[in-house]
């Protein structure tokens, strides 16, 4: 059984929705067990509520130690000035012990994101996540152009060869489209298939 973790942080629900699509794609691959977990919130609850952040997310909170139990880890975070959120960075910064043991060497890693605008730093945010995974010796999987939704200019949409993505708009009113969710599913399935091949 190939074990896949979809690990995410979501402020307003966009990445939470994308995480579910990624998990759906991974589950479509026979012999795959998928867990969806989030990283801890760092914003005080009162501040988060006043900002309208989505706090009722059912996914359990992950621990750093459990990362070593998975064959693949797909990390999702919205952008903050062109990089991952402090919540996700704080979590990944605690993985030094795993790095020292080589606990994630050879496992599959991937990333997905959301931005407020079409040019809001999707690729740099993905790179900020992927850099961490590469330092752990993980085999990185993106979202290749074999996913047809990456091509075409008929609509404003997320999606890059470095990972699935969505555009939220400045007020968060835009929700992930079917093309963007399709990219998330495609990437999730590709990660699961790749991890299964590496496990032999």
UniProtKB/Swiss-Prot annotation:
It is an enzyme of class 1 (oxidoreductase). Keywords: Flavoprotein, FMN, NAD, NADP, Nucleotide-binding, Oxidoreductase. The keyword Oxidoreductase applies. Its EC number is 1.6.5.2. FMN binds at residues 10-15, 79-81, 114-120, 135. InterPro entries: Flavodoxin/NO_synth, Flavoprotein-like_sf, Flavoprotein_WrbA-like, FMN_Rdtase-like_dom, NQO. It comes from the Bacteria. Residues 4-191 form the Flavodoxin-like domain. Pfam families: FMN_red. SUPFAM superfamilies: Flavoproteins. GO terms for molecular function: flavin adenine dinucleotide binding; FMN binding; NAD binding; NADH:ubiquinone reductase (non-electrogenic) activity; NADP binding; NADPH dehydrogenase (quinone) activity. Substrate binds at residue 99. Binds 1 FMN per monomer. It catalyses: a quinone + NADH + H(+) = a quinol + NAD(+); a quinone + NADPH + H(+) = a quinol + NADP(+). NAD(+) binds at residue 12. Its cofactor is FMN. GO terms for cellular component: membrane. HAMAP family: NQOR (MF_01017). Belongs to the WrbA family. This is NAD(P)H dehydrogenase (quinone). It comes from Rhodospirillum centenum (strain ATCC 51521 / SW). The lineage of its organism: Bacteria, Pseudomonadati, Pseudomonadota, Alphaproteobacteria, Rhodospirillales.
């Amino acid at each position: 059984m190939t074990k896949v973790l979809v690990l995410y942080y979501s402020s307003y629900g966009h990445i939470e929705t994308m995480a579910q699509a990624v998990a759906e794609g991974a589950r479509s691959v026979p012999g795959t067990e998928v867990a969806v977990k989030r990283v801890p919130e760092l914003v005080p609850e009162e501040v988060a509520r006043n900002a309208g952040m989505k706090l009722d997310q059912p996914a359990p909170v992950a621990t750093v130690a459990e990362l070593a139990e998975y064959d693949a880890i797909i990390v999702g975070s919205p952008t903050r000035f062109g990089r991952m959120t402090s919540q996700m960075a704080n979590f990944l910064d605690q993985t030094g012990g795993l790095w020292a043991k080589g606990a994630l060497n050879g496992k599959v890693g991937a990333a997905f994101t959301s931005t407020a605008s079409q040019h809001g730093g999707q690729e740099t945010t993905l790179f900020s996540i992927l850099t961490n995974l590469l330092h752990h010796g993980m085999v990185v999987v993106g979202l290749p152009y074999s996913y047809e939704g990456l091509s075409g200019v008929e609509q404003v949409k997320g999606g890059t060869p470095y990972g699935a993505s969505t555009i939220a708009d400045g007020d968060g009113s835009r929700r992930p489209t079917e093309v963007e969710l399709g990219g998330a599913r495609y990437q999730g399935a590709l990660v699961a298939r790749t991890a299964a091949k590496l496990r032999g």
